[in-house]
């Protein structure tokens, strides 16, 4: 592992060096710094200085920074190129019967200072162009920085291992604090990119707080970066790639022998796996491609599906355009593992309602997505005791994901799928029924909310409050769905209350926002969108593909919505008061009546209470309805 540190003070010679014709290199004095990048002329301690011209490329530079004793070449690459040309000329001379040139000497290792200074000058223009390009491509979202946000508030982020569907989610175990990596050295005035070793101080999803080796307890130059970025490498990568390791300018005079320092510091330390970047690349390959056809829920009529076409794929998230959309603006966002999308023919196979397309044949280039690419549901046995129409249960309201409501099974489909209606809110034609699988983590047996101290939303118009299941079942002549039929699996998900993450706003699924886990009930997570009121919170399963680690948006190039500011919330409040939006069934901004409004309407201010949860972060509701939009 320590072979990589030779590049800190020496350059590893190649196997062809024995044939090169350059003379032996005079070693630099041991007390000379590894690199002087303070703008002064490169000189030896005895004060000698001057200029030289490279005999290979013609570059003019400081003589002391040139390569070899004779200072004929600006870099080892020019020296070797010159030697290669000389060798070819010698062979040609032999073929022509001319006497050969003198025998080449063995090329010895060259101290880094000479090679690096000339190489830096040679690549200055290219490096500046690269910096300009990088600066132009950077996306700034109102100046939001996960690193600053976490540091200033002492937040913690959910580990990447909590998100099995995310890149590297299943192979993140080796990444931890104190792991050493090679990263670009930004504390350097050289115009070319050089590297140095840094240790992970803190992890926040894909992001890591790093500290350069040599700073010890000094945090003045600590910085955040995305571990899956292209400039992050395991220790030893620089040596294998011929890249220079240069200590930061702030501490360059701290040690006279940096190689010995690194060997001592890194003995027994962990680094990234050698194939880490390859694993990152492989984990970001997605089988869904543009022009694939799928069946997806109709966002205007939740009880049915429609055909849609994959327009784009970003980090496994699909932008689907409904096939009949002429201007291609009628779209829907979801993850490729979402339970809302299915293969063509799925609706017919299970008896689900389906909106037939007016398009009689496939458009050119469009093709059906292979069925094996879709998420598999758990097989169930419907031959014995099973769900029946009319049975009561509790379910997350798909049109108001902050609430768990009294619900009814309206239809039993094939393969374990159920059509669920929210009591008191159903349309007469059943157009707002929603399809859940029997193993879905979004449906619960009667009494789940009471046992877990979650507020259960009663049917709209139901006046006998507080709501009691026993009384309601008797009044409606209904029975509760058997508890044993529900999914009771609780994975060891690793989430903790207070953890930060990036979460899809499922009411506006094109938006991914800064969010916090505020409550955990078995496998159920309550997700709060930072900067927004609690009425916008959403109940989400721990294995939902709509949750991502901190840094996911940066990694995939998706736009992250920062926490809403006070001014934006106030403007939202003002606009909502001026214009009340009509009720719709879209996954887009629809919000039902809040608890406070329901209380005022039903009881005219009389005291009442629901079953409150044990968490201090439980939503209290609000009398004002805001429509959450992009900040």
Swiss-Prot record:
A zinc finger (FCS-type) spans 45-80. The keyword Zinc applies. GO terms for molecular function: histone H4K20me2 reader activity; methylated histone binding; NuA4 histone acetyltransferase complex binding; zinc ion binding. PANTHER family: MBT DOMAIN-CONTAINING PROTEIN 1, POLYCOMB GROUP PROTEIN. Gene3D superfamilies: 2.30.30.140, 3.30.60.160. It is found in: Nucleus; Chromosome. Residues 1-31, 563-631 are annotated as: Disordered. PROSITE patterns: MBT, ZF_FCS. Keywords: Acetylation, Chromatin regulator, Chromosome, Metal-binding, Nucleus, Repeat, Transcription, Transcription regulation, Zinc, Zinc-finger. This is MBT domain-containing protein 1. MBT repeats lie at residues 144-248, 256-353, 354-459, 467-563. Its main location: nucleus. Residues 564-576 have a biased composition (Low complexity).
């Amino acid at each position: 592992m320590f072979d990589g540190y030779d590049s800190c003070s020496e350059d590893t010679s190649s196997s062809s060096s024995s044939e090169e014709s350059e003379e032996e290199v005079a070693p630099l004095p041991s007390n000379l710094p590894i690199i002087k990048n303070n703008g002064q002329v490169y000189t030896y301690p005895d004060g000698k200085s001057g200029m030289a011209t490279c005999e290979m490329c013609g570059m003019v530079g400081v003589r002391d920074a040139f390569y070899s004793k004779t200072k004929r070449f600006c870099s080892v690459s020019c020296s070797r190129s010159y030697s290669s040309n000389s060798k070819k000329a010698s062979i040609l001379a032999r073929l022509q019967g001319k006497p050969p040139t003198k025998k080449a000497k063995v090329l010895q290792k060259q101290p880094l200072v000479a090679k690096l200074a000339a190489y830096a000058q040679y690549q200055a223009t290219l490096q500046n162009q690269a910096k300009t390009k990088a600066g132009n491509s950077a996306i700034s979202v109102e100046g939001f920085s996960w690193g600053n946000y976490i540091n200033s508030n002492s937040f913690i982020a959910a580990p990447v291992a909590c998100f099995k569907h995310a890149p590297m989610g299943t192979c993140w175990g080796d990444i931890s604090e104190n792991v050493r990596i090679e990263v670009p050295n930004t504390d350097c005035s050289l115009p070319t990119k050089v590297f140095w070793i840094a240790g992970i101080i803190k992890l926040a999803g894909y992001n890591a707080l790093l500290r350069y080796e040599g700073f010890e307890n000094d945090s003045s130059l600590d910085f955040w970066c995305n571990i899956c970025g292209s400039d992050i490498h395991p220790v030893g990568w620089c040596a294998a790639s011929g890249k220079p390791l240069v200590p930061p300018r702030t501490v360059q005079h701290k040690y006279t022998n940096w190689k010995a320092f690194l060997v001592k510091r890194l003995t027994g330390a962990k680094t990234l796996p050698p194939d880490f970047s390859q694993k990152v690349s492989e984990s970001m390959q997605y089988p869904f491609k543009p022009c694939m056809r799928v069946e997806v829920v109709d966002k205007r009529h939740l009880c049915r599906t429609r055909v849609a076409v994959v327009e784009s794929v970003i980090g496994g998230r699909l932008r689907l355009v409904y096939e009949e959309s002429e201007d291609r603006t009628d779209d829907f966002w979801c993850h490729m593992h979402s339970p809302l999308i299915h293969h063509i023919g799925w609706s017919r196979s299970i008896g689900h309602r389906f909106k037939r397309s007016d398009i009689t044949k496939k458009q050119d280039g469009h093709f059906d997505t292979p069925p094996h690419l879709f998420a598999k549901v758990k097989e169930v046995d419907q031959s014995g005791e099973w769900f029946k129409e009319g049975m009561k249960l509790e379910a997350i309201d798909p049109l108001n994901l902050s609430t768990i409501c009294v619900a009814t099974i309206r239809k039993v489909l094939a393969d374990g799928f159920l059509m669920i209606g929210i009591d008191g809110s159903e349309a007469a034609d059943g157009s707002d029924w929603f399809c859940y699988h029997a193993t879905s983590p979004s449906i619960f047996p009667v009494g789940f909310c009471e046992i877990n101290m979650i507020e259960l939303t009663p049917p709209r118009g139901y006046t006998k409050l507080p709501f009691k299941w026993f009384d309601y079942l008797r009044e409606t002549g209904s029975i509760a769905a058997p508890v044993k039929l529900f999914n009771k699996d609780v994975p060891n998900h690793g989430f903790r209350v207070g953890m930060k993450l990036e979460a899809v706003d499922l009411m506006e699924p094109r938006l991914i926002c800064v969010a916090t886990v505020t409550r955990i009930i078995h496998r159920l997570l309550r997700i709060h969108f930072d900067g927004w009121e609690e009425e916008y919170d959403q109940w989400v399963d721990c294995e939902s593909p709509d949750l991502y680690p901190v840094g996911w948006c940066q990694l995939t190039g998706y736009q992250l919505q920062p926490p809403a500011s006070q001014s934006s919330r106030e403007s939202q409040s003002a606009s909502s008061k001026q214009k009340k939006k009509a009720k719709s069934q879209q996954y887009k901004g629809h919000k039902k009546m809040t608890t406070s409004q329901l209380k005022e309407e039903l009881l005219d201010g009389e005291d009442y209470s629901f079953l409150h949860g044990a968490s201090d972060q439980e939503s209290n509701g609000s009398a004002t309805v805001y429509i959450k939009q992009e900040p």
